[in-house]
Every structure is written in C-alpha cells, then in structure tokens.
Amino acid sequence: MHDHCAALLGDLDSVVREFSTLLSTSKRRRLPALTQETSRKSYESSSTADEFFDAEAGDLDRSQLVIIEHQSEEDTPGSDADEASIHSSSSVSSVGDDDKVFSSSPDNLHPGKPKSLIPLPLTDVVNRRATIPQATVQPPSLIAFVRKNVGKDLSTISMPVSANEPTSLLQRVAEQLEYAHLLDAAVKQKQPRDRLLYVTAFAVSQFSCSRVRERAMRKPFNPLLGETFELLRTQGETAGEGGIGGGFRLIVEKVSHRPVRLAMQADGLAWSFAQSPAPTQKFWGKSAELTTDGRVRVTLRLPDGTDERYSWAVATVFLRNVVMGEKYVEPVGSMAVSNDSSGARAAIEFRSRGMFGGRGEDVVVEVYGSDGSRDGSGLVGTWTGGLRISDQGKPSGPEIWKPGSLVPNAPNTYGMTTFAASLNEITPLEKGKLPATDCRLRPDQRLAEQGKLDEAEDWKVKLEEAQRSRRRVMEEKGQEYRPRWFVKAAAAQDGEEVWKLKGGKDGYWEERAKGTWTGVDDLFNV
C-alpha cells in the first residue's frame, strides 16, 4: 500500500511539474511586459471564459494572446481584499457607417417599451419537461488534459464534448430570467423602497442556478457567431406570488466572437430587461475568477405611467478547486443595485466563510436613500435558499424569494434546475417558428443531450470549421460582421459596450410573426 501511494504521489508531482513547465514556457513565448496595474498574478484570457476550452474561439492563423503567471492563491498577499474589489473592463469595437448608433445618455441605455409586445400576453398552457437524460460519462480531468497537450497552444485545442453540459451559453444567461415574476411583483409595490427590494432579490436570484455543486463541473456550449436563443414564458408560468402574469419574451444573440459578447433583451407586460454580457476569466492556481462585463438594466413601467430605471453590475463569481477537489462556485464581494431614476440603491454583500470555511452562501442587503442615508430596511438570507425582508439586519418580514425546483437526481443530471432543463426543449410555442440560428436546432448540442457523444463530437468539429471558413471569407472581402437583431449603442460614459434590440420591420419579434426570417444564415447546415 505504501508503494502504491508513493507511486501515485510521484505521478502527481510529475503532472504538476509538467503543468508548471507548460505555463512558464508559454509565458516566456508570448508574454509582453507586465504593467504595474497588475495587482496579483494570474492566468488571464484576453477574450472569454470559453476560449480557453473551445477551439472554435481560437484562430488557426493567429495565436491568441494570453497572459500566464503561475502562482497559487496562498502565495499571493492580499488576495482576500482583491476578491472584494474586482472591476471588469469593457471591449469596444468600431461600428460600420451603415449601423444605427443610439445615444449614450443614461436613459437611452435602458430598454424602453417596445411599440409591439407580440406575442404577449401568452395564455397557452404548456406542459414542459421536468428533466433531461442523465450524464453518461464524467467530465474530463483538467490535469489529464494539460498533461496530454504539453507544449501545444491551448487556445487552439478543443476540449471534448464531455466537458459540456447540453445547453448553450445563450441559454445559461437566459437563466437570469427564471424568477422574472419578481419584476412583476416589483411593479405592484406602492413604495419605491419595496420596489427596490424586489428588483434586488431578482438580481441575487440569478446565482441560484449554480447552487448544486455538479453544475460547476461542466460548461455550456460556446455559441457560434450569430447563434440565437428565444424564450417564451406564459401567463401561468410567470404569475408567481404577487406577480401580474402575462408571460415574457426573451431574445439572446451572440454579437461578437473575439471577445465573445452576447446581447439580450426580455420584455414583460410591465417591464423590460437588457444586458450585453461579455464573460471573462482568470486562473489563480486553484481557482478561476469569472467576471461579466456588461451592466444589467431594467425598466419598470409603473401604473401611473412613469418609468423607473434600475441597473447593476453582476458580482464576481469564483470557481473553486479547478484542478482537483470538489468544484463549486460562489459569488464574492459585493454588488449594488441602483435606482437610476431616484438615486437610491441597495448594497449587496456576499459573505465569505474564509479560506477553509467552504462555500459562502449568506447574503445581506442594505437600502440607501437618494441622499445616501440608511433607513434600516433590507434583505437577509442566502443565494442558495431564499431572501427575507429585514430591519436592522434581522428578519422582520415575509420571504420574497426562494429558489425553484431541481431536476430529479440533480447530481447525476448536470446539477440542473427544472427551469434549465426546459430550455433546450421545443414546445408548441416554438415548433415551426424558430429561426435557423436558434441553439435548440444545433446538432452537436442536441446529440450531447441524448448521450450520443461521438456523433456530437463529429458535429462540433464540422460546425467549428464552417465558422472559421465564414470568418476567412469575410476577412478576404474586407467585410465586418453585423449582428442581425441588435445594433451597438454609443459607448456609455465608462466605456461600457451596449447593444440595443432592433425594432420595427427589422425586429426579431416582427420577423417571427411574419415567419420570413429575412437575412438569417443557416448556421447549422454544414
């Protein structure tokens, strides 16, 4: 037994040495001089979280620049303070002369009420599936992957399909809308403070989709450029406790490939939600830091005819134990939900349990008035279990949010919620009405859901190569890609890149109603 353990330790030491050598070699080969702004050492992709793992995000003709520093969290002084004060940067690209550019005034960056809300309200009764087939294999080991590819450019190497859960990144960001009934409920509140609390509960609720640790073991499929996802929810599905129902509609599109950026807008009868998220990551030895550039903006359309505008930057999330051990994710530090109409705000603190305390789940919310004063109201609870109205930091009122159900046997079914499991299903609401770009129609993702991983792998390779071919053709012609459904707004004052949903005859929902899908590429026909 002693010899066996010694052999295992020897193999592990060898892998760690190879991993360190690979990172050090890649650093010397590609690393420019570091600026003094770097607060601590990390492995940082200059693009997105998915590009490290997906070959479709790499460019075979041009190596992607990555910054690699090999140093563990324990070796880095002040890492706890850094986690609480992380700010993501934005990436702004040029806009073609023919593109419509929206004003960057704060009000115009928020979503307005569309002229038409078709197909709302949705009163249909839809029987959605409550689960998907269980995973048939374990996800690959990162150590084994690195060991196998020592000396290679990792940005051009594709992880196998078994590293993915059978959903798209487009669907993952759509999970923010699982608790949209909180926005309906916010509109019904008479006091501005109460509306702020409901919107804040909605902002916190998005993290609950990762409460099962197995959800951290795999990543969603990286969408192709121009790939889309629409989501419709009916009146019965969104009524909720205190909600007004009527359902909502959502469209998400991948608008940029390098760096990956999505654009999304959801509309209910009395609210609109918009975001242009660009996920990025840094590796810190044992953990990965996941940040999202792109503020969430929500507009509530109040019964008196006025609009109330809110916004927030999504908190940083850490994926723990990346290389070995039990993986899990946790939001860290703080975030603030601002009432941009009044100046009031809600300060959210995600409380840490320390280096050896395990996952931090506690959440404390404090409300500040437009003059910066506190009135003692807020929320307490956990991002995994629910939030309750509080006074002076102690529970004093009803629970206004609790997470929804998980699929049966969630640990063996990708750790999914019931809501997430329903997203890749084509229901009567979508059948025959989806554009050719909708990720539900993507063959490799569908085959992966069915457990046919070898076939999914073949399709993934074909789709990636077709995307590279399209990009080469555009580069040869000197053309710039223009998204079909969103147009870039003028940069916000802080440089944030914001995309706005087109309306009128060029709008997604108008094209859907006609069923023509003008100017839509058949991305999956390869």
Residue ranges, per PLM feature:
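Extended acidic, Ser/Thr- and Pro-enriched interaction/regulatory segments
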Residues: 1-184, 188, 193-526
